[in-house]
């Protein structure tokens, strides 16, 4: 049985931990507001750009003059998986959900006889995926968004992906990230970015009369210029969504940890009081027994 001194030390230790988790919760809540605003602001632009490009690309799909980012390499052999996680932990299942999804995709592709490459974006992706898929890992990115995600960082990731595609190092690229739903809910999203997925009903995606486009210069030249920018835009969106999801998950995890610490303190306090009461009772019995012996 723990002594009163041990119980007091445990209570002090848990109270100290509660202060830390409470502070981390408040910091995450503050960062969440900024990250959520940024993610929600970027989402409509990225979605609109996808729809517009889908409409434009639909007319070129299958044609010999279509940009490679639409037509692809003509093969489906090598897949690049871009796993977006955080650099730090203490955010519940945020990182593990991406790692599980990436592992599931990797295992499925390998089972189909495909070749895979994994680009980790975030320290946790690198640390956790290299245990089972270290031989497939390539150079990735860490320490992004220390003061908030900026477009230049997303463009850096997109540029490396584009360079690899131009060098024919892969055929298909899929980004795996957490889409922000709320502070307590994130959705694992798998988004194919290369080749650009042309919706079957792209021309019918907009309500109302269909837009008529005039191209200057040619449609192919415009798409060849816009598609790499769209890749950077989609990466920017993925990083913003991931950052908002991370802060929401961390705030929720620290809130739960703070509550659990409070429950533990109450339980230890009850145990301490009972032990102290038992010790006092024992001492009283010893005094009374000694007095009776006299």
UniProtKB/Swiss-Prot annotation:
PROSITE patterns xref list: ATPASE_GAMMA
Keyword terms: ATP synthesis, Cell inner membrane, Cell membrane, CF(1), Hydrogen ion transport, Ion transport, Membrane, Transport
Subcellular location: Cell inner membrane
Any one biological process term the GO annotation gives: proton motive force-driven plasma membrane ATP synthesis
Superkingdom, taxonomy of origin: Bacteria
GO terms for cellular component: plasma membrane; proton-transporting ATP synthase complex
Gene Ontology terms, MF aspect: ATP binding; proton-transporting ATP synthase activity, rotational mechanism
Coiled-coil region: none
Pfam families in UniProt: ATP-synt
Subunit structure, as described in the record: F-type ATPases have 2 components, CF(1) - the catalytic core - and CF(0) - the membrane proton channel. CF(1) has five subunits: alpha(3), beta(3), gamma(1), delta(1), epsilon(1). CF(0) has three main subunits: a, b and c.
UniProt function note: Produces ATP from ADP in the presence of a proton gradient across the membrane. The gamma chain is believed to be important in regulating ATPase activity and the flow of protons through the CF(0) complex.
PANTHER family registered for this protein in UniProt: ATP SYNTHASE GAMMA CHAIN, ATP SYNTHASE SUBUNIT GAMMA, MITOCHONDRIAL
Family: Belongs to the ATPase gamma chain family.
UniProt name for this protein: ATP synthase gamma chain
Organism listed in the record: Paramagnetospirillum magneticum (strain ATCC 700264 / AMB-1) (Magnetospirillum magneticum)
Upper classification of the organism: Bacteria, Pseudomonadati, Pseudomonadota, Alphaproteobacteria, Rhodospirillales
Gene for this chain: atpG
């Amino acid at each position: 049985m723990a002594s009163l001194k041990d119980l007091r030390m445990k209570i002090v230790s848990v109270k100290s931990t509660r202060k830390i988790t409470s502070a981390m919760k408040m910091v995450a809540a503050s960062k969440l507001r900024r990250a959520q605003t940024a993610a929600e602001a970027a989402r409509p632009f990225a979605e609109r750009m996808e729809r517009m490009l889908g409409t434009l690309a639909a007319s070129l799909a299958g044609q010999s003059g279509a940009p490679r980012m639409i037509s692809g390499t003509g093969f489906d052999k090598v897949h690049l998986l871009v796993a977006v996680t955080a650099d730090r932990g203490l955010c519940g299942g945020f990182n593990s959900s991406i790692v599980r999804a990436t592992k599931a995709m990797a295992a499925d592709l390998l089972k189909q006889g495909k070749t895979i490459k994994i680009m980790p974006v975030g320290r946790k992706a690198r640390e956790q995926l290299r245990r089972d898929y270290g031989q497939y890992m390539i150079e990735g990115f860490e320490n992004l968004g220390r003061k908030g995600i900026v477009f230049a960082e997303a463009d850096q990731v997109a540029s490396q992906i584009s360079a690899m595609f131009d060098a024919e190092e892969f055929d298909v690229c899929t980004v795996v990230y957490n889409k922000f739903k709320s502070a307590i809910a994130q959705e694992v999203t798998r988004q194919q970015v290369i080749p650009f997925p042309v919706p079957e009903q792209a021309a019918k995606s907009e309500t109302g009369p269909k837009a008529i486009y005039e191209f200057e210069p040619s449609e192919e030249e415009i798409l060849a210029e816009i598609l790499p920018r769209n890749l950077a835009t989609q990466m920017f969106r993925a990083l913003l969504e991931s950052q908002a999801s991370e802060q929401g998950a961390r705030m929720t995890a620290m809130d739960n940890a703070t509550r659990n610490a409070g429950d533990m303190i109450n339980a230890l306090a009850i145990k301490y009081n009972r032990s102290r009461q038992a010790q006092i009772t024992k001492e009283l019995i010893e005094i009374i027994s000694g007095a009776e012996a006299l």
